[in-house]
Amino acid sequence: MLTYEAFLRRESDFDGQVFVGVKTTGIYCLPSCKAKKPRRENVVFFPTKEEAVRGGFRSCKACFPSLPVGRWFDEGHTVSLRTPEPFSFEECLQFLSRFSNECLHHIENKQICKAIKIDGRQTLLRIRKAGGDIKLEFLNPCPHKPTRLAAAEFVCEWFDLFSNVTAFYEFAEKDIVLHKLVRRYEGLRLIGIPDLFEAITWAIIGQQINLSYAHTLKKNFVTRFGDKLSHGDREYWLFPEAERIAGSTVDDLIQVGLTRRKSENIIHLSNEVTVGSISKKKLINNDYAASYETLLKLPGVGDWTANYAMMRCLRYPSALPISDVGLHNALKHQLELSEKPTINDVRELFSRWKGFEAYATFYLWRSLIS
């Protein structure tokens, strides 16, 4: 058990086992953090970083307790991330390379380039496998350390490196359907959409249309309203920020190919995000039911859209977009059915997979990629 005296001595043995919240700053740290130590009455200990976040504390930019302890290495112009097992960078790239008209990242020579924004600064990353690690390279002028490590945190969340999927794999090995998928796609992680506005907007864009056309609309939307970085002879786009869309009109969005209803719903969402009525921070502090009900209050957000966002952004393991057409097609193929399963069929099947619905869905989606 970490004592205040051990905290003062900066004992690193407790790093990752205990997280220290500082009431006066609203920051949580590792016990070994080199920052000035607060007085005893201003310290609160948390067993997990998630509890620290739920307590209203944000990650320290000196010790970065949000990153996996002992699994990241800042090398100046690059950052290396030691990946947890099981993990397959190749499988993740396979999923991310499904559509040739994807506009938010570029994959070439088993490397992925992506532009992100951290604290208002645009950064261009190249991510590649390096032995058992993932290496992040910064292609525009190298940012300072806090930005580099915030970029590493983004990649960890994007590739779901914070999650321990061992329990899912152990469960799947005993299941007649899932065991084939985890063996075939071993190491695949549930690729996320870390930004809440992007996740919900993308889900709204994709409602009731096929994925190929949805990607075309997304590209129109991004290149009309988003920012871009140039490197070499290529442009790298960032998803539009909520503030930019909140300042747009319905007719502006219709011009990129969206329906009037979808345009209205996306602008409403952008206003809610801009004023802070809905945020990722608020939602992840809720349980599944509370977050689900909050999302359903947004115009244009039904069961599928809510669960899609909860699965890919909020990381609820039980999120299940039960009406998803791709999910139904995957189940038809895996179960060798003559026709697609009904909603009740899907619900009955997933009742056997309680607590693993999100990962089961993602692996079934993966099975659709030739």
Where are these regions (language model features)?
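HhH-family (HhH-GPD) DNA N-glycosylase catalytic core used in base-excision repair
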Residues: 1-370
